[in-house]
Swiss-Prot record:
Quaternary structure, from the entry: Homodimer.
Entries under InterPro entries matching the protein: Ade_phspho_trans, PRibTrfase_dom, PRTase-like, UPRTase/APRTase
Name under which the protein is recorded: Adenine phosphoribosyltransferase
Gene Ontology terms: biological process: adenine salvage; AMP salvage; purine ribonucleoside salvage
Keywords (A to Z) from UniProt: Cytoplasm, Glycosyltransferase, Purine salvage, Transferase
Functional note: Catalyzes a salvage reaction resulting in the formation of AMP, that is energically less costly than de novo synthesis.
Subcellular location: Cytoplasm
Family per similarity comment: Belongs to the purine/pyrimidine phosphoribosyltransferase family.
GO CC field: cytoplasm
Species, as recorded: Methanococcus vannielii (strain ATCC 35089 / DSM 1224 / JCM 13029 / OCM 148 / SB)
Length: 173
């Protein structure tokens, strides 16, 4: 299945010059959603994963599907102030400044193997923040999987030493 045909391109969103890659048509179509889940699952099957982590918000959508398929738990990583229990946090670099991510303090046990699932790898800032957060609380990041990768933004370069999968690659913004 060619997932590229299911990704909607929206020019000049969220700002002029950006060509937004919208994954919601994949989620709307059961066959595309199932195919995406299966492709990520196949990649992760031999990596001895204990838990799936997904960053807010679209990482939740794909991460939950993959976790369910692999019969694993799912852990959300959120922006500050969104999780009700004790959290660990990490600051991470954005193109212009810093942001923060949080995870529940009891969500990953020391030594657990973690796969991070998200919709998009762009500059790598968010996923690098997620990996630091997982490692900070004792997890091992065994794999990273993305539906889309924007190769011209070189996010993969920040992820050396990690197993990285992307299903669809674009070389434009």
């Amino acid at each position: 299945m060619d997932l590229r045909k299911k990704i909607r391109i929206i020019d000049d969103f969220p700002k002029k010059g950006i060509s937004f890659k919208d994954v919601t048509p994949i989620l709307k179509d059961p066959k595309s959603m199932k195919h995406t889940t299966k492709e990520i699952t196949k990649y992760l099957e031999d990596k001895n994963i204990d838990v799936i982590v997904g960053p807010e918000a679209r990482g939740f959508l794909f991460g939950i599907l993959v976790a369910q398929e692999l019969d694993l738990g799912f852990v959300p990583v959120r922006k500050p102030g969104k999780l009700p229990f004790k959290t660990f946090s990490v600051d991470y670099a954005l193109e212009y400044g810093l942001d923060r991510l949080e995870i529940h303090s009891d969500s990953i046990e020391k030594g657990q193997n973690v796969a991070v699932v998200d919709d998009l790898l762009a500059t790598g800032g968010t996923v690098l923040g997620v990996t630091k957060l997982v490692e900070k609380i004792g997890g091992n990041v065994s794999a990273l999987s993305f539906v889309i990768e924007l190769t011209n933004l070189n996010g993969r370069d920040k992820l050396k030493g990690y197993n990285v999968q992307s299903l669809v690659k674009y070389d434009d913004l």
